[in-house]
Amino acid sequence: MKITDIKIRKIFTEGPMKAIASVTFDHQLVVHDIKIIYAKEKYFIVMPSRKNEDDTYRDIVHPINTSFRQTLERAVLQAYYDAAEAQSELRESATFIQM
């Protein structure tokens, strides 16, 4: 399964959740609501989940092996870093223009 598109849908500036992403596989399947989290001095992804009746969470969809999880995480985090940098550059240029 090949990752064919990653969209960073929303970036947050406060709190441990830094962004929400959607990932498309083979131009045929999209997984929404992958969360990008920063905690314990590192970034990682959290797959979409649903709250159970006992107040625990269960992933709706998730990688079933470590290799694919690492590939997915690297790709999503790189897309986040690129989007966050672009957003930062936009803010800086907007500030410069307002001066």
Predicted regions located by residue number:
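Single-stranded nucleic acid-binding surfaces, predominantly the OB-fold ssDNA-binding core
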Residues: 1-99
